[in-house]
Amino acid sequence: MSLLTEVETYVLSIVPSGPLKAEIAQRLEDVFAGKNTDLEALMEWLKTRPILSPLTKGILGFVFTLTVPSERGLQRRRFVQNALNGNGDPNNMDKAVKLYRKIKREITFHGAKEIALSYSAGALASCMGLIYNRMGAVTTEVAFGLVCATCEQIADSQHRSHRQMVTTTNPLIRHENRMVLASTTAKAMEQMAGSSERAAEAMEVASQARQMVQAMRTIGTHPSSSAGLKDDLLENLQAYQKRMGVQMQRFK
Protein backbone atom coordinates (compact mmCIF):
# COMPACT_ATOMS: atom_id res chain seq x y z
CA MET A 1 0.00 0.00 0.00
CA SER A 2 1.46 3.36 -0.98
CA LEU A 3 1.90 6.07 1.63
CA LEU A 4 -0.86 8.29 0.21
CA THR A 5 -3.27 5.34 -0.06
CA GLU A 6 -2.61 4.60 3.59
CA VAL A 7 -3.20 8.23 4.59
CA GLU A 8 -6.45 8.34 2.60
CA THR A 9 -7.62 5.09 4.23
CA TYR A 10 -6.99 6.32 7.78
CA VAL A 11 -8.47 9.78 7.22
CA LEU A 12 -11.65 8.42 5.60
CA SER A 13 -12.11 5.95 8.48
CA ILE A 14 -13.12 8.85 10.77
CA VAL A 15 -15.54 10.50 8.30
CA PRO A 16 -19.20 9.47 8.76
CA SER A 17 -20.67 7.49 5.84
CA GLY A 18 -22.83 9.38 3.37
CA PRO A 19 -22.56 11.52 0.23
CA LEU A 20 -20.11 13.88 1.98
CA LYS A 21 -17.67 11.00 2.57
CA ALA A 22 -17.65 10.23 -1.17
CA GLU A 23 -17.03 13.93 -1.89
CA ILE A 24 -14.14 14.10 0.59
CA ALA A 25 -12.62 10.90 -0.86
CA GLN A 26 -12.70 12.52 -4.31
CA ARG A 27 -11.07 15.71 -2.98
CA LEU A 28 -8.30 13.68 -1.28
CA GLU A 29 -7.66 11.68 -4.47
CA ASP A 30 -7.46 14.90 -6.52
CA VAL A 31 -5.10 16.52 -4.01
CA PHE A 32 -2.83 13.46 -3.85
CA ALA A 33 -2.78 13.23 -7.66
CA GLY A 34 -1.77 16.91 -7.88
CA LYS A 35 -5.02 17.81 -9.68
CA ASN A 36 -6.27 20.28 -7.06
CA THR A 37 -3.77 23.02 -6.35
CA ASP A 38 -5.99 25.78 -4.96
CA LEU A 39 -5.46 25.44 -1.21
CA GLU A 40 -7.47 28.58 -0.39
CA ALA A 41 -10.61 27.31 -2.17
CA LEU A 42 -10.15 23.83 -0.73
CA MET A 43 -9.97 25.16 2.85
CA GLU A 44 -13.01 27.38 2.31
CA TRP A 45 -14.94 24.35 1.02
CA LEU A 46 -13.84 22.25 4.03
CA LYS A 47 -14.72 24.96 6.56
CA THR A 48 -18.37 25.07 5.43
CA ARG A 49 -19.01 21.30 5.31
CA PRO A 50 -21.80 20.17 7.64
CA ILE A 51 -21.76 17.02 9.85
CA LEU A 52 -17.96 16.85 10.27
CA SER A 53 -16.61 17.38 13.79
CA PRO A 54 -14.18 20.29 14.28
CA LEU A 55 -11.35 17.77 14.90
CA THR A 56 -12.07 15.89 11.65
CA LYS A 57 -12.06 19.23 9.79
CA GLY A 58 -8.79 20.13 11.52
CA ILE A 59 -7.15 16.85 10.48
CA LEU A 60 -8.36 17.21 6.87
CA GLY A 61 -7.17 20.83 6.79
CA PHE A 62 -3.76 19.71 8.07
CA VAL A 63 -3.55 17.00 5.36
CA PHE A 64 -4.55 19.44 2.60
CA THR A 65 -1.99 22.00 3.82
CA LEU A 66 0.77 19.36 3.87
CA THR A 67 -0.04 18.17 0.37
CA VAL A 68 -1.07 21.18 -1.72
CA PRO A 69 1.83 23.44 -2.70
CA SER A 70 1.16 27.01 -1.56
CA GLU A 71 2.87 30.37 -1.22
CA ARG A 72 4.90 30.62 1.95
CA GLY A 73 2.97 33.58 3.33
CA LEU A 74 -0.44 31.90 3.05
CA GLN A 75 -2.50 32.58 6.16
CA ARG A 76 -3.12 29.69 8.58
CA ARG A 77 -6.83 28.99 9.05
CA ARG A 78 -8.46 29.64 12.43
CA PHE A 79 -10.83 26.63 12.23
CA VAL A 80 -7.84 24.29 11.85
CA GLN A 81 -5.88 26.01 14.65
CA ASN A 82 -8.85 25.80 17.04
CA ALA A 83 -9.40 22.12 16.27
CA LEU A 84 -5.73 21.25 16.81
CA ASN A 85 -5.24 22.94 20.18
CA GLY A 86 -5.89 19.77 22.23
CA ASN A 87 -9.08 21.24 23.74
CA GLY A 88 -6.94 23.95 25.32
CA ASP A 89 -5.70 21.41 27.89
CA PRO A 90 -2.14 22.33 29.04
CA ASN A 91 -1.55 18.64 29.79
CA ASN A 92 -2.11 17.83 26.11
CA MET A 93 0.28 20.59 25.11
CA ASP A 94 3.04 19.28 27.43
CA LYS A 95 2.68 15.80 25.97
CA ALA A 96 2.57 17.23 22.44
CA VAL A 97 5.93 18.96 22.97
CA LYS A 98 7.48 15.71 24.28
CA LEU A 99 6.05 13.81 21.32
CA TYR A 100 7.33 16.45 18.89
CA ARG A 101 10.87 16.13 20.27
CA LYS A 102 10.72 12.38 19.66
CA ILE A 103 9.23 12.39 16.17
CA LYS A 104 11.40 15.17 14.77
CA ARG A 105 14.31 12.72 15.05
CA GLU A 106 12.33 10.22 12.96
CA ILE A 107 12.46 10.12 9.19
CA THR A 108 9.95 7.40 8.32
CA PHE A 109 6.16 7.34 8.28
CA HIS A 110 5.95 4.04 10.19
CA GLY A 111 8.54 5.08 12.78
CA ALA A 112 6.60 8.26 13.59
CA LYS A 113 3.25 6.44 13.62
CA GLU A 114 4.60 3.80 16.02
CA ILE A 115 5.82 6.44 18.49
CA ALA A 116 2.63 8.51 18.17
CA LEU A 117 0.28 5.59 18.87
CA SER A 118 1.28 5.57 22.54
CA TYR A 119 -0.19 9.09 23.00
CA SER A 120 -3.83 10.19 23.41
CA ALA A 121 -5.79 11.75 20.54
CA GLY A 122 -5.71 15.11 22.38
CA ALA A 123 -1.90 15.12 22.61
CA LEU A 124 -1.62 14.03 18.97
CA ALA A 125 -3.95 16.82 17.82
CA SER A 126 -1.89 19.36 19.80
CA CYS A 127 1.28 18.07 18.18
CA MET A 128 -0.30 18.51 14.73
CA GLY A 129 -1.21 22.03 15.85
CA LEU A 130 2.45 22.80 16.65
CA ILE A 131 3.46 21.73 13.15
CA TYR A 132 0.51 23.47 11.48
CA ASN A 133 1.34 26.75 13.27
CA ARG A 134 4.96 26.43 12.07
CA MET A 135 6.26 26.14 15.63
CA GLY A 136 7.91 22.90 14.64
CA ALA A 137 9.02 21.29 11.41
CA VAL A 138 9.06 17.61 10.46
CA THR A 139 9.19 15.78 7.14
CA THR A 140 5.89 15.24 5.32
CA GLU A 141 6.23 11.48 5.90
CA VAL A 142 6.53 11.97 9.65
CA ALA A 143 3.57 14.39 9.67
CA PHE A 144 1.49 11.79 7.83
CA GLY A 145 2.51 9.19 10.44
CA LEU A 146 1.14 11.53 13.09
CA VAL A 147 -2.11 11.99 11.12
CA CYS A 148 -2.65 8.23 10.74
CA ALA A 149 -1.94 7.53 14.43
CA THR A 150 -4.52 10.19 15.40
CA CYS A 151 -7.13 8.73 13.03
CA GLU A 152 -6.44 5.25 14.41
CA GLN A 153 -7.05 6.45 17.99
CA ILE A 154 -10.31 8.17 16.95
CA ALA A 155 -11.49 5.21 14.84
CA ASP A 156 -10.77 2.84 17.76
CA SER A 157 -13.02 4.80 20.12
CA GLN A 158 -15.73 5.11 17.43
CA HIS A 159 -15.53 1.35 16.87
CA ARG A 160 -15.88 0.68 20.61
CA SER A 161 -19.01 2.82 20.89
CA HIS A 162 -20.42 1.32 17.66
CA ARG A 163 -19.81 -2.18 19.03
CA GLN A 164 -21.55 -1.22 22.27
CA MET A 165 -24.58 -0.09 20.29
CA VAL A 166 -24.64 -3.20 18.09
CA THR A 167 -24.33 -5.56 21.06
CA THR A 168 -26.67 -3.65 23.36
CA THR A 169 -29.48 -5.72 24.83
CA ASN A 170 -31.76 -2.69 25.09
CA PRO A 171 -34.61 -3.62 22.72
CA LEU A 172 -35.60 0.01 22.06
CA ILE A 173 -32.11 0.95 20.85
CA ARG A 174 -31.86 -2.21 18.72
CA HIS A 175 -35.29 -1.50 17.20
CA GLU A 176 -34.38 2.09 16.33
CA ASN A 177 -31.02 1.00 14.93
CA ARG A 178 -32.73 -1.53 12.64
CA MET A 179 -35.13 1.14 11.38
CA VAL A 180 -32.31 3.63 10.75
CA LEU A 181 -30.36 0.95 8.84
CA ALA A 182 -33.47 0.05 6.83
CA SER A 183 -33.91 3.73 5.85
CA THR A 184 -30.24 4.03 4.89
CA THR A 185 -30.44 0.85 2.82
CA ALA A 186 -33.56 2.19 1.07
CA LYS A 187 -31.66 5.36 0.21
CA ALA A 188 -28.75 3.29 -1.17
CA MET A 189 -31.18 1.34 -3.38
CA GLU A 190 -32.63 4.58 -4.75
CA GLN A 191 -29.16 5.97 -5.48
CA MET A 192 -28.05 2.76 -7.21
CA ALA A 193 -31.21 2.52 -9.29
CA GLY A 194 -30.29 5.37 -11.60
CA SER A 195 -31.95 5.03 -14.98
CA SER A 196 -31.63 1.27 -15.49
CA GLU A 197 -34.58 -0.82 -16.62
CA ARG A 198 -34.83 -2.27 -13.12
CA ALA A 199 -34.94 1.17 -11.53
CA ALA A 200 -38.72 1.04 -11.01
CA GLU A 201 -38.40 -2.25 -9.13
CA ALA A 202 -35.68 -0.90 -6.83
CA MET A 203 -37.60 2.33 -6.20
CA GLU A 204 -40.71 0.32 -5.33
CA VAL A 205 -38.91 -1.83 -2.74
CA ALA A 206 -37.16 1.22 -1.26
CA SER A 207 -40.40 3.19 -1.13
CA GLN A 208 -42.23 0.35 0.67
CA ALA A 209 -39.43 0.17 3.26
CA ARG A 210 -39.54 3.92 3.87
CA GLN A 211 -43.33 3.81 4.33
CA MET A 212 -42.99 0.89 6.73
CA VAL A 213 -40.38 2.71 8.84
CA GLN A 214 -42.49 5.89 8.81
CA ALA A 215 -45.58 3.97 9.94
CA MET A 216 -43.64 2.20 12.72
CA ARG A 217 -42.29 5.49 14.00
CA THR A 218 -45.66 7.23 13.81
CA ILE A 219 -47.82 4.66 15.55
CA GLY A 220 -45.14 3.05 17.71
CA THR A 221 -44.63 -0.71 17.53
CA HIS A 222 -43.25 -3.55 19.58
CA PRO A 223 -39.40 -3.45 19.55
CA SER A 224 -39.19 -6.89 17.93
CA SER A 225 -41.42 -5.90 15.00
CA SER A 226 -38.54 -4.37 13.03
CA ALA A 227 -36.36 -7.49 13.27
CA GLY A 228 -37.17 -8.77 9.78
CA LEU A 229 -37.44 -5.38 8.10
CA LYS A 230 -33.73 -4.65 7.74
CA ASP A 231 -32.89 -8.24 6.72
CA ASP A 232 -35.63 -8.31 4.04
CA LEU A 233 -34.44 -5.02 2.65
CA LEU A 234 -30.78 -6.08 2.59
CA GLU A 235 -31.77 -9.31 0.85
CA ASN A 236 -33.69 -7.32 -1.76
CA LEU A 237 -30.76 -4.96 -2.25
CA GLN A 238 -28.26 -7.81 -2.68
CA ALA A 239 -30.55 -9.64 -5.12
CA TYR A 240 -30.99 -6.37 -7.04
CA GLN A 241 -27.20 -5.83 -7.13
CA LYS A 242 -26.62 -9.32 -8.53
CA ARG A 243 -29.13 -8.74 -11.32
CA MET A 244 -27.48 -5.42 -12.08
CA GLY A 245 -24.05 -7.07 -12.08
CA VAL A 246 -22.94 -4.83 -9.21
CA GLN A 247 -21.16 -6.50 -6.36
CA MET A 248 -20.55 -4.66 -3.14
CA GLN A 249 -17.93 -6.63 -1.27
CA ARG A 250 -19.41 -5.84 2.07
CA PHE A 251 -22.72 -4.26 2.81
CA LYS A 252 -24.09 -4.03 6.32
From Swiss-Prot:
Residues 1-164 are annotated as: Membrane-binding. The keyword Transcription regulation does not apply. It comes from the Viruses. Keywords: Host nucleus, Membrane, RNA-binding, Viral matrix protein, Virion. One of its GO terms (biological process) is viral budding from plasma membrane. The keyword Secreted does not apply. It is found in: Virion membrane; Host nucleus. Belongs to the influenza viruses Matrix protein M1 family. Plays critical roles in virus replication, from virus entry and uncoating to assembly and budding of the virus particle. M1 binding to ribonucleocapsids (RNPs) in nucleus seems to inhibit viral transcription. Interaction of viral NEP with M1-RNP is thought to promote nuclear export of the complex, which is targeted to the virion assembly site at the apical plasma membrane in polarized epithelial cells. Interactions with NA and HA may bring M1, a non-raft-associated protein, into lipid rafts. Forms a continuous shell on the inner side of the lipid bilayer in virion, where it binds the RNP. Determines the virion's shape: spherical or filamentous. Clinical isolates of influenza are characterized by the presence of significant proportion of filamentous virions, whereas after multiple passage on eggs or cell culture, virions have only spherical morphology. Filamentous virions are thought to be important to infect neighboring cells, and spherical virions more suited to spread through aerosol between hosts organisms. This is Matrix protein 1. It comes from Influenza A virus (strain A/USA:Phila/1935 H1N1).
